[in-house]
Amino acid sequence: MSNMDIDGINTGTIDKTPEEITSGTSGATRPIIKPATLAPPSNKRTRNPSPERATTSSEAIVGRRTQKKQTPTEIKKSVYNMVVKLGEFYNQMMVKAGLNDDMERNLIQNAHAVERILLAATDDKKTEYQKKKNARDVKEGKEEIDHNKTGGTFYKMVRDDKTIYFSPIRITFLKEEVKTMYKTTMGSDGFSGLNHIMIGHSQMNDVCFQRSKALKRVGLDPSLISTFAGSTLPRRSGATGVAIKGGGTLVAEAIRFIGRAMADRGLLRDIRAKTAYEKILLNLKNKCSAPQQKALVDQVIGSRNPGIADIEDLTLLARSMVVVRPSVASKVVLPISINAKIPQLGFNVEEYSMVGYEAMALYNMATPVSILRMGDDAKDKSQLFFMSCFGAAYEDQRVLSALTGTEFKPRSALKCKGFHVPAKEQVEGMGAALMSIKLQFWAPMTRSGGNEVGGDGGSGQISCSPVFAVERPIALSKQAVRRMLSMNIEGRDADVKGNLLKMMNDSMAKKTNGNAFIGKKMFQISDKNKINPVDIPIKQTIPNFFFGRDTAEDYDDLDY
C-alpha cells in the first residue's frame, strides 16, 4: 500500500479554511435565545427541540401553533426522505475519504466513523468548550490542538491473492466542511437525522456494554439494567432522546443532580440548574405508567431541599419500574451505510416507518460487514448487530429467537466484543464477516411496557423491556423483586411509598401464566399487509435475559 507512515496508518487531511466554505456567512447575526420558562407538569409529549437547543421566543411558539399537523403518511414520507439523504451524505463522505469499493462502504466501522465525525462537527457547544480549554492548556505549556478539525479511523480494503482484509487509516476533515456538506444534502439543519444517529449509537452501547459502574455510582442495583436504556444518549438529543430513555436512566440523572445539590446548596438557586432538574423530574413523571409512581415523583418535585430522602424515593421508583414498566419508545436504527444502498437494493417505497415493516424489510435486504476483533465469532457478532439495530438489549431472548429462527445467547455466552475497535487493536490485515442473522418473521415495535402481567425469570438481569408487540409472557424474576420490596417505608411520605409497594405486590401476585400484548401476532417477513398472523412460539430452553450473568466490557472503561 502507498502513502504509509511509520505506524502503518494512512493519515489523509482535507485542507480548506472555514472562510472558503462558508463564503462570508459566518458573520450572520444569531437569534437571541431567551431563558426557558418552567412549564407545569403535563403528560403531553413536547415537540422535539434541536440538538443546539430550540429558541423559546414568542415568534417561534406562534409559528408552531400555525403549523399544520402532519398526517401519518406525510410523516412516513419525511422519514423516508431523511434516511435516503443520510445515505447520500455517507456516499459523499466516502468519496472525500477515497474509499469507493463496495466492501469498504458496507463496513459498519466506516459508517460509525462517518457518523461520529458528523456528530463532532455539528456539536458547536463542545467545539467552543474544547477551544477555550485548549487555549488555557497552551498557556500552561501543553500542545496546541486544532479543534476546527475532526477525524476518525476508517478501514481500507486490501486484496491479497484470494484473501480480502482491511487496514486502518486515519482521516481528518474540517468541521465546517462536514457541516456545510450535511446541511446542503439534507436541505435543512437536519436535526432529526442527528437525533436518529445518536439513538443508533446509544442502542449499540446498550447491547455491547454493561453499565454496572454507572448504576452503582448512583446507588442502584445492577439488576435494574433493563430500566437503563439510552444511558449514553447526549443531552442534545432532545425530546426524541427522552422518549428512548428508560426510567432508570432518568432516575440516575435526577439522583446525580441531587448529589450535586447536596454538595453545593446554592446550585438550585441558579434558575438554569433548577429548570434543568425540574425538567428531568417532569420527564420522569411522564414516563411513569402508574398513578402511584407519578405520586412519588410529585413528592420529589415538591421537596424544597432535595436530599437523602428523595434519593431513597427515586431508588424505590426505579425498583417499581421493573414490575410496572414505563413507556420507552423503540425504533429500528440502521448504520447509514445501509441507507446509502437504498437505490441499489430496489427498495421501491416512498414511505418509511422506523417502527414497522419498511425498516425491517430494509434490514433483511442489506449486506452489512463488520471487522472481526481478536477472538470474535462471526455468528455471535451478527447477534450483537441485530440487537443493536432493533434496540433489543433488554428484550426477551425467546422472542428474538422466534422472529429470526436463530437461538440467541446471553451476553456472557457470546464470543465477541463491541464494534468499536480500540487503537491498540488496530493492525494491518484485519478480517471481516457478513452479519448474517435475518428476520424470518416481523412484528410492529412498541412503546408500551406490556404491563398486563408478570412472568417467571432468572438471576442477574431480573426483568425485560419489550421491544416487539407480540403476545407472550413477560419475563420477570419474582424472587429478586421480592428481595427489593423488603425496605423501610417510614418517613414523610409513608403513604405514597406504601401505595407503591402495594401496587408492586399486587402485580407480583398475578398468575404467571397470563400474557402481555394480548392478541398481537407476528407475520412472515413477506406478509407486509399482515394478512396471515402467526402465534409466536416461545422456546423454554433459551434464557430470557441477555444480561443474565454479564461479562461484557463496561462502557466507562472504553478506550476511545
UniProtKB/Swiss-Prot annotation:
Region (Disordered): 1-73
Pfam family, one: Flu_NP
Protein localization: Virion; Host nucleus
Modification note: Late in virus-infected cells, may be cleaved from a 56-kDa protein to a 53-kDa protein by a cellular caspase. This cleavage might be a marker for the onset of apoptosis in infected cells or have a specific function in virus host interaction.
Keywords of the record: Capsid protein, Helical capsid protein, Host nucleus, Host-virus interaction, Ribonucleoprotein, RNA-binding, Viral nucleoprotein, Viral penetration into host nucleus, Virion, Virus entry into host cell
GO biological process, one term: symbiont entry into host cell
InterPro entries hit by this protein: Flu_NP
Molecular function GO labels: RNA binding; structural molecule activity
Chief place where the protein resides: virion
Record text on subunit structure and interactions: Homomultimerizes to form the nucleocapsid. May bind host exportin-1/XPO1. Binds to viral genomic RNA. Protein-RNA contacts are mediated by a combination of electrostatic interactions between positively charged residues and the phosphate backbone and planar interactions between aromatic side chains and bases.
Function, as annotated: Encapsidates the negative strand viral RNA, protecting it from nucleases. The encapsidated genomic RNA is termed the ribonucleoprotein (RNP) and serves as template for transcription and replication. The RNP needs to be localized in the host nucleus to start an infectious cycle, but is too large to diffuse through the nuclear pore complex. NP comprises at least 2 nuclear localization signals that are responsible for the active RNP import into the nucleus through cellular importin alpha/beta pathway.
Family: Belongs to the influenza viruses nucleoprotein family.
Protein name: Nucleoprotein
Species per Swiss-Prot/TrEMBL record: Influenza B virus (strain B/Ann Arbor/1/1966 [wild-type])
Lineage: Viruses, Riboviria, Orthornavirae, Negarnaviricota, Polyploviricotina
Gene that encodes the chain: NP
